[in-house]
Amino acid sequence: MSVAHVALPVPLPRTFDYLLPEGMAVKAGCRVRVPFGKQERIGIVAAVSERSELPLDELKPVAEALDDEPVFSTTVWRLLMWAAEYYHHPIGDVLFHALPVMLRQGKPASATPLWYWFATEQGQVVDLNGLKRSRKQQQALAALRQGKIWRHQVGELEFNEAALQALRGKGLAELACEAPALTDWRSAYSVAGERLRLNTEQATAVGAIHSAADRFSAWLLAGITGSGKTEVYLSVLENVLAQGRQALVMVPEIGLTPQTIARFRQRFNAPVEVLHSGLNDSERLSAWLKAKNGEAAIVIGTRSSLFTPFKDLGVIVIDEEHDSSYKQQEGWRYHARDLAVWRAHSEQIPIILGSATPALETLHNVRQGKYRQLTLSKRAGNARPAQQHVLDLKGQPLQAGLSPALISRMRQHLQADNQVILFLNRRGFAPALLCHDCGWIAECPRCDSYYTLHQAQHHLRCHHCDSQRPIPRQCPSCGSTHLVPVGIGTEQLEQALAPLFPEVPISRIDRDTTSRKGALEEHLAAVHRGGARILIGTQMLAKGHHFPDVTLVSLLDVDGALFSADFRSAERFAQLYTQVSGRAGRAGKQGEVILQTHHPEHPLLQTLLYKGYDAFAEQALAERQTMQLPPWTSHVLIRAEDHNNQQAPLFLQQLRNLLQASPLADEKLWVLGPVPALAPKRGGRWRWQILLQHPSRVRLQHIVSGTLALINTLPEARKVKWVLDVDPIEG
């Protein structure tokens, strides 16, 4: 009898064997319902064979086959199989992650009826001026008069569901549902919107990509902020859609704005589907199916849209390719950018990686000849670059982390009826210990790196060599007792600014204040209306948002990036600074950027200010080569957590011994730790980690694979929660 090897969404790196009943035929990639323990579960057939490691009479039969054909396309299936192996993650978890929720639940892989809004007869004739007191209702009814609006697309528009419900209450709009009809956009395809005239650099980029349209090619589109990268994407898509092929456009979580989506919808007379967190399960399945059967011409989405099946994919675009949100930080820790390149190679199509501040790994791949670079160096509209200033904080009396000079400049810009942005980049920065009076930083005597401050354990610790020392009472350089951790949080800053600027509306935009659905849009709308004059934010604010009245931008905790134990923090700061500089001074207003630091002479600041991001990247790549850090080497991070701060370090020490005893290990394998994680305690659990480094990615993969096969033999393995992160981007 045939045996189905079934992947289930459980944290075990294996498949489970079931007998296929007489007459039941399934293929790899089809869903089945199987008995598992005392219940039935949905599984995915990974393979079918005639044998099992267990006696056949001990196997249970498959209860039901749910699909005649695989739910995955051939290329996505190959991608997922490879990714499960590369990231050492359970195959069942990987396969289920790539499916819409309704398919995970066993629902049919077919379209369900969708709801849409339409204008009633009264709504078609009523005077729109009667709604002028409610701008959103007026906008909504005007849009409905142009045609029906699918309910799942309301979040992409300038009005909201509440406005439509209000119109419904007045008898001007109504809801109905219908099964989406299979439509072919290709016969009526045209470019609907206005084309902008491409400059020479843009035209060269479009031509180069078009010349390689029939094979794999990876292009870095490096363009300064405001240089017109989106127009290049649109022109490339124009060529792809004209051939009847489809396009996948990936954007960071925060970049999926109504304005971005509108640009694509207005340009093409072809269906654009958007995959984002605001969709309900049936809407997400509908968009997924439209891509699979070829109905969707363009899919725009965040990280997980990478796994969408397409009937005939012609190009992949990854906007802001350096953005850290492309790396999944929970569960299966994959990097969508890296997997997208793998997929493009498998599909034999071009991929475009766009950024004003390319990741060092991407620039390294250009140097290695794996990618080709296209550069856009001219800013659209000849906007003037912002004026840049560095404020030395040493010995200055600070209020809420702000120097007197910065507070004075803020007052001047606010009095001119402009807006001010204050940036904090706390995410991923490890705190260092700094003397406020002379600028001394606690430095490890054995390494060329800075101690990380661990307040809870009352000590300084080096995350490179693991040496530690007590927190000093006074500065060894000047004797001052004014020793402070570098950095301040957005919440404390908001509270401290209120008494300094009592009449000025303040808006804080970070993950805490925008976690509720629609909250980010509400904050941004308030900013555009002029309702908030001071904006406090993290990197979320730096990405692509156009604030015409912002003329002053300040980065407050620069030292946190310059002296972090995380070797990537300088790169992240350089990217943030470059993006932020583009936020100040648009719409004909002169912008100003102010950096606050205790170390104005720092080489990184000097390079960034006077030579720009490209020069910084050259310098940073050279430094990483000297220190043998990625991209010159490969990393795997293994983190363990416990409740008592004892089992996790013990487990990791046992694991370290196992790794170093591996017959595959050689003198080039470098292991750091166990050391406390940069955030040593979260949710009541203590976190420890070890970092593995090797110049050969393939060799490191073999070492890790061999060790993981033995990990459950370790005495502490079942007493801790542990995770493995291949190519980690955060320490």
Swiss-Prot record:
Binding of Zn(2+) 1, residues: C435, C438, C475, C478
Protein's GO biological process: DNA recombination; DNA replication initiation; DNA replication, synthesis of primer; double-strand break repair
Gene3D superfamilies linked: P-loop containing nucleotide triphosphate hydrolases, PriA, 3(prime) DNA-binding domain
Helicase ATP-binding domain ranges (all copies): 210-376
GO CC, one annotated term: primosome complex
Reactions catalysed, as given in the entry: Couples ATP hydrolysis with the unwinding of duplex DNA by translocating in the 3'-5' direction; ATP + H2O = ADP + phosphate + H(+)
Region CTD, annotated ranges: 633-731
Positions of the UniProt region annotated as CRR: 431-485
Domain Helicase C-terminal: 470-637
Gene Ontology terms, MF aspect: 3'-5' DNA helicase activity; ATP binding; ATP hydrolysis activity; DNA binding; zinc ion binding
Motif (Aromatic-rich loop (ARL)): 326-340
Catalytic activity, EC: 5.6.2.4
Residues engaged in binding ATP: G223, I224, T225, G226, S227, G228, K229, T230
Region (Helicase lobe 2, C-terminus) residue spans: 486-626
Activation/inhibition comment: ATPase activity is stimulated by single-stranded binding protein (SSB).
UniProt domain comment: Has an N-terminal DNA-binding domain (residues 1-177) with 2 subdomains and a C-terminal helicase domain (residues 200-731) with 4 subdomains. The 3' DNA-binding domain (3'BD), bilobed helicase core, Cys-rich region (CRR), and C-terminal domain (CTD) interact with one another to form a shallow cup. The circularly permuted winged helix domain (WH) projects away from the cup and is quite mobile. Nucleotide (ADP) binds between the 2 helicase lobes, while the surface-localized CRR binds 2 zinc ions. The aromatic-rich loop (ARL) probably directly binds DNA.
Protein name in UniProt: Replication restart protein PriA
Organism: Klebsiella pneumoniae subsp. pneumoniae (strain ATCC 700721 / MGH 78578)
